[in-house]
């Protein structure tokens, strides 16, 4: 059956700021306390979406979350009106204010793990929300992510959206950023490659930075998504590269159809894994980048592998890269050699995503890949699909509500909270989402 990959991109939120919240993500740590530009960040993301949509790649949008997220501050013991809660936390524990104001939901590669209908036992598209248990600021995302996904994939006959796994370290799940699908045409059954960093009873794990994904979580997600057990491979990421800042697999590998583009040191027991994929995926092609050409450090600093590998109708592929790749002589030299070599990659497309990149999120972090048949695509909430009208409406919305300068101190401004809620109210109507945000269901929550 014919099917297409639709990229659902996260829209950057109004409180996008640099707080260094993500230990193990070296860009996040390095840019801590710098001044951010939320308006520019949102527009950079929108331009990527629209450019790819115009090039013929189906594209949709996932909206930001409510931030600062007052209900969690109340759980932490701060009381009074919303304004009083903000004032108290800013004075007594500003680190909590930064955490509950993170715009990290923009990186929707961590929102959920997807199983297309061609891979599932019941013939539905399955989406399991990620619990993002390893980082407090990200662990807050799952309930609203679930509401948003149910508002977008709202036809229960075609889509099953599953709640996140229990919030415990043993079941740490980071979503599609640790998941690849390999195979032929999108509508054919594919091989799902789940990548984990640690498992109970296995001493092979990183020592410097945390391994966020567990094998136990990956196995549970595969079950929830009803993936045919014959179409699943579990593989461990190389713990040494996690210790070099590869906090998700999509920082060191990206797949599309029959191609796996990865670093030579991406996986534990890599030659064994690639042999397994060759045996089980027709036409499988591994493009392994040697460490002698691109070091892990350079891969992390440029986000070479946090790229999007997109298929054209003629079978050729386009690699979507952040500008940092073009600015690095060694990486750009390698990429031009890659273009000349015998493989499906025939074009490099570069985007300026500096605002997201400075927090450790490249092109692949910003998108959730969902393979859909034509019938399934028609069943998606049409208001989220990118086109000229939506692009213009979202740009106008960003111009109206987003600030062009934000520091950590600004997060305590009650006006920022009010601006954010008004903006999301308008956006949820624009995207026909219903009341997906807690403040909408609580009537504002200003008392």
UniProtKB/Swiss-Prot annotation:
SUPFAM superfamilies, sorted: Pentein (SSF55909)
Enzyme class label: hydrolase
Gene3D superfamilies: Succinylarginine dihydrolase
Catalytic function, reaction form: N(2)-succinyl-L-arginine + 2 H2O + 2 H(+) = N(2)-succinyl-L-ornithine + 2 NH4(+) + CO2
Keywords, sorted A to Z: Arginine metabolism, Hydrolase
Pathway assigned in UniProt: Amino-acid degradation; L-arginine degradation via AST pathway; L-glutamate and succinate from L-arginine: step 2/5
Family named by the database record: Belongs to the succinylarginine dihydrolase family.
Function text: Catalyzes the hydrolysis of N(2)-succinylarginine into N(2)-succinylornithine, ammonia and CO(2).
Record NCBIfam families: arg_catab_astB (TIGR03241), PRK13281.1 (NF009789)
Family matches, as HAMAP family: AstB
Name of the protein: N-succinylarginine dihydrolase
Originating gene: astB
């Amino acid at each position: 059956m014919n099917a297409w990959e639709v990229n659902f991109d996260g829209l950057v939120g109004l409180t996008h700021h640099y707080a260094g919240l993500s230990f193990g993500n070296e860009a996040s740590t390095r840019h801590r306390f710098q001044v951010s530009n939320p308006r520019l960040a949102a527009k950079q993301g929108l331009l990527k979406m629209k450019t790819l949509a115009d090039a013929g790649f189906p594209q949709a949008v996932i909206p930001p979350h409510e931030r600062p997220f007052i209900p969690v501050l109340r759980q932490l013991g701060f009381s009074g009106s919303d304004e009083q809660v903000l004032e108290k936390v800013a004075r007594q524990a500003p680190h909590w204010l930064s955490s509950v104001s993170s715009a990290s939901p923009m990186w929707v590669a961590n929102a959920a793990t997807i199983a297309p209908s061609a891979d599932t036992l019941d013939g539905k598209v399955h989406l399991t929300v990620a619990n993002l248990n390893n980082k407090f600021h990200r662990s807050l995302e799952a309930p609203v992510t679930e509401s948003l996904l149910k508002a977008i994939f709202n036809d229960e006959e075609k889509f099953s959206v599953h709640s996140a796994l229990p919030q415990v370290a043993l079941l740490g799940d980071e979503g599609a950023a640790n998941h690849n699908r390999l195979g032929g045409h999108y509508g054919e059954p594919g091989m799902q490659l789940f990548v984990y960093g640690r498992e109970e009873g296995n001493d092979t794990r990183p020592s410097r930075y945390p391994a966020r994904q567990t094998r136990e979580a990956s196995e549970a997600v595969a079950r929830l998504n009803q993936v045919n057990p014959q179409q699943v491979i579990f593989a461990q990421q190389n713990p040494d590269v996690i210790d070099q800042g590869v906090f998700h697999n999509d920082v060191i590998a990206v797949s599309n159809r029959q191609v796996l583009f990865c670093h030579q040191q991406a996986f534990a027991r890599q030659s064994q894994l690639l042999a397994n994929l060759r045996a089980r995926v027709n036409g499988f092609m591994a493009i392994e980048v040697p460490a002698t050409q691109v070091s892990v450090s350079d891969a992390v600093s440029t986000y070479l592998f946090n790229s999007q590998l997109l298929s054209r109708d003629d079978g050729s592929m386009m690699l979507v890269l952040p500008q940092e790749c073009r600015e690095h002589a060694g990486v750009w030299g390698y990429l031009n050699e890659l273009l000349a070599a015998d493989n499906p990659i025939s074009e490099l497309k570069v985007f300026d995503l500096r605002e997201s990149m400075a927090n450790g999120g490249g092109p692949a972090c910003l998108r959730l890949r969902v393979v859909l048949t034509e019938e399934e695509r028609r069943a998606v909430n049409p208001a989220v699909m990118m086109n000229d009208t939506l692009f213009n409406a979202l740009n106008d919305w960003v111009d109206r509500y987003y600030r062009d300068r934000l520091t950590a101190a600004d997060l305590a401004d009650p006006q920022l909270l009010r601006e954010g809620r008004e903006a999301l109210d308008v956006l949820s109507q624009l995207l026909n989402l219903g009341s997906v945000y807690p403040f909408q269901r609580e009537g504002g929550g200003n008392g």
